[in-house]
Amino acid sequence: MTRKTLLGGVSAAVFVVAAAGVGLADIRTGDSLVINGEIPIVTETEPPAHLDGALSTLYSGWVFRTDETRAMQADDFDNPGMLYVEQGISAFNTAMGTEGNSCASCHENPESLANVRPSYPQWDEAHGEVQTVEMQVIECQTERMGMEEPYGYDSQQMRNMVALIASVARGQTVDVAIDGPASEAWELGREIYYTQYGQMELSCAQCHEQNYGNLIRADHLSQGQVNGFPTYRLKNANIVSVHNRFRGCIRDTRGEPYAIGSPEFVALELYVASRGNGLTVEGPAVRN
């Protein structure tokens, strides 16, 4: 993998991109997102202390979208991501594996999982590692349901299930723990976030910390918050996972990405999720 550690400032690569037509766009602040007229979503708030002033305000990706895209997310009837949530509900109630259990056998209903998405990724003491929601689903399927072939990490079935888990947590505050045994993975994620990748020598920070609100290829750069994932991307006509988006970003730098579900991407997700502590869960969000 081609990478270069960011030592400070905006790199020559960013200057080249800027010279190619990136223009500063006004951030539309102050607008409110209330899903279905009853679930208020925090779209801007003060950053967590552990960012040490890297951002003055946290902004949901919703802030950077057009009126049309915003409206789609505000109503479940118009949100295409909810079609995948419905598929997740069907899977939730379907028995799988040799044990003959469904998710509902243990959890009764999806709403009982409302506290999951706001706190993940999180340290799993039994397995001695930081786990994402996807890893937890795989653990349940293999260890409790007897599935020899659990959902693939980025499979459609997995994305449907994680979209369901996110949907029941909408409006709950993101509160990802980064202390204790999770701190080592968090530090790795932070290192990856500030590392330049690919031929363009770009880091996550150079786009999403130093240039959010600017236009690149006719689209607004956001802060790269992950509180809306899995996200329905209009360009993909499907819901997209956090790691799939990480992979796409690194590919955009003309670099070779880590594997989906790899320890590196798990660490990066932990770090990026913690940057959004104080926002609220809004997945499945709608983005370009």
Predicted regions and their residues:
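N-terminal secretory signal peptides that target proteins for export/translocation
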Residues: 1-4
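Post-cleavage N-terminal segment of exported redox proteins
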Residues: 6-84, 121-187, 235-257, 265, ...
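Extended intrinsically disordered, low-complexity coil regions enriched in Ser, Thr, Gly, Ala
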Residues: 98-104, 217-220, 286-287
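The canonical Cys-X-X-Cys-His
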Residues: 99-110, 161, 189, 199-211, ...
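Short cysteine/histidine-rich zinc-coordinating motifs and their immediately flanking basic loops
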Residues: 114-121, 216-222
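Extended amphipathic alpha-helical interaction segments
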Residues: 167-219
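C-terminal cap of thioredoxin/glutaredoxin-like
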Residues: 191, 198, 206-212, 224, ...
